[in-house]
Every structure is written in C-alpha cells, then in structure tokens.
Amino acid sequence: MSEQHGAQGNPFPGEPNTGHVWDNNLRELTNPPPKWWMWGLHASWIFTLAYFLAYPSIPLLSSHTKGFLHWTSMSEYRADLKEIEQVRLPYEKRIAALSATDILKDKELSDYSQRTGKVLFGDNCAACHGANGAGNVGFPVLADDDWLYGGTIDKIQESITGGRSGVMLAFAQQLSPQDIDRLAQYVLEWSAGTQAADTEGKRLFTSAGCVGCHGADGKGNQLMGSANLTDKVWRFSHEKEDIKRIIAHGVNFVTDPETRRTQMPAWGQRLSATDIKKLAIFVHELGGGK
C-alpha cells in the first residue's frame, strides 16, 4: 500500500518525487523529460496539424476536405504522365514518320519500340496469345517461326491492322465418317513424318480438294492462311478426335453450326498507327520474325 508523506516526512529528501512511497522504498519520481524530447513532441503535433490542413483529410458524406494545397493523386499522376510523354515525344515523332521496316534498321528506335510494344502487347494481345507470345489453345504461338499469313514485318503489321478470319471448308456432307477418320489419321502421320506408305490417305487428301489450300506437299499457303500440315505445330489440338471435328465442320464455315469459330479482331480502329508499328516490331522480334 502507498504511503503519502508531506514535505517534512519525505524519507528521500532532496529527491524529485511525488511523495508517494510503496513498501518503504518504491516511489514515483517527477523527473521532467529532456527539452529535445519536448521539442520533438510539439513539432510532431504541429506537423500533423499542418499536414491535416494542407492535404485531403476529412471524409464527408459525398466528398472530403480538399486541403489548401488542393493536391490529388490523379493530378500528380497527370503531371508525371505529361513529363514522361515529353520524354517519349521525339521517339514517337520519328516512329510516326518511318515505316516499320526502317524502324527495325535503327537500333535505338527498334529498342524503344520493343519496350513500349511489350506494354501494348500485355494490354491488348496477351489474353489470347499468352505472355510473350507463348500462345494458347486455339490461338497461334507468336514466338516461333510458323506463320499462317507470313512473318515479315509488313505482314505482321497487316494482320494487326486488319485482323484475320480464315476459313476452312466443312467436309461432313462430302466425306463419310470412315473417310474423315482416315484423313485425320493421314494428317497426324504427315505431321509425324510417317505418312508415306498411306496411299489411301493421300488419295483422299487429293480427291477431297485439301491440296487446293494446303498444297500437294501439305505445307500450306500463306496467301490463304492455310496451315502447314507437315510440321508439329498445331493451332488447335493434335488429338485425332479434334482433327476429325475440324475436317467435318471446318473453321468459320458459316453454314455449319458446329464449325470452330475463331477470329482475330482488327486493331486499326482501336490503336494508333504508331502503336501498331510498335506492336508489330515487338511481335517480329519475339524470335520468329522473317
């Protein structure tokens, strides 16, 4: 229990304490904090009050106090964006004045286009074509050298600008299920390099008219966007049942309700000509550009 002693009865005379003593020894001292600590304390609440008044701080029903500086994160963002746009402006002007082919010849502009094109690709293209052009099922890989419509910088720019919507005929009404099965097997073997002995498959491939688009050698035709059947690159699936479905119902064949629907949208009205050039250069430099 505490005992309170008067000034005359303080058992520790000369010591700055409150006079409260516990267990004849424990007492409450009255040492003041150092001046530097008190200055820090007062400086902290003064700074807090100034910050409170200068910046947005108090939420209201439909708004908030603005602060006498009228600062907002959006105004800071716009100022930073304006600053970086001034840095980019000389590059953007040069890109606008040159063709994509000429930009590729200029290392500085090419590097700039690839860096900014990567951002554009992530915002607009990666959802279908995957990060860094790795592809997804139904969407072409852009990092290899297998191109449906050509891998030159001009062809890539053309594909981005106008989009692509290739068509493959449906053969369900022309071929029997057995013929479709045999043809699918032939295409599988062709991709694996083991089709040479399949004379019946070759006959079907020719008589059904497949050679008209894919060529007698099966290597496709970039003017038509027809696939190369002799490599191991599959836009959709290499499973036999999926190949049979494509042969039977085609791709984007409007009169067949079971056709595989696939289309690349045109970006000519969504992106500026400069952005399309940068995107084309980024895709071209992923590794498969011609």
Predicted regions mapped to residue ranges:
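Sequence/structural segment immediately N-terminal to covalent heme-attachment motifs in c-type
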Residues: 109-134, 148-150, 157-162, 194-223, ...
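Glycine-rich, flexible loop/turn motifs
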Residues: 18, 25, 29, 138, ...
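Periplasmic c-type cytochrome electron-transfer domains
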Residues: 2-108, 149-155, 170-187, 268-283
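Short, solvent-exposed mixed-charge patches
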Residues: 289-290
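Basic, gly/Ser/Thr/Pro-rich low-complexity segments located predominantly at protein N termini
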Residues: 39, 53, 122, 135-138, ...
